Amino acid sequence: IVQLESFINPNWITDIKLNKNPVSNLESLSNEFTSGLISVPVLGGGTANTEFEVITGMSAEFFGSGGFPYNTIASKKAIPSLAYTLRDLGYSSNSLHNHEGKFYSRDVVYQNLGFDSFTPIECMSTPERTPVGWAKDSVLIDEICNILISTDNSDLIFGISIQGHGGYPSDYIE
């Protein structure tokens, strides 16, 4: 599972004409492998709540308006999750995020969600950066590939990207 921060398929934007498909690789992978769309609980912030809902199947709304289960319950105790379920079926589970491990308490939370390992940016090779300073997703993809190469098990890999995070240009395309 790869969660792409702030991603939108540019082909869905009406009233623009593109010279070529900017997401042809993604569409090819989506056609070849299991993929789908998901409705997320947040807009303009709170990526961790989307992560929480995907991994646990629980709504973040159950934990109060404006709350972050990662910073409250999930940082304090084990929470039933996809990682625990798949562990019982013999899977190894790895979570990765190309941002700081302490942000949203991910360094603790992923252990409480049943992941065997969590790899934050601090444990990755030095990444290229976006113009606004976020780590590019190439470092995340490299780490995912390293995990896949190094294991013979069935794996649950949950990668959370940050490359698409704001700020965003405020000028308009003519």
Describe the predicted segments one by one.
Residues 1-4, 8-174:
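Solvent-exposed soluble domains appended to multi-pass membrane proteins
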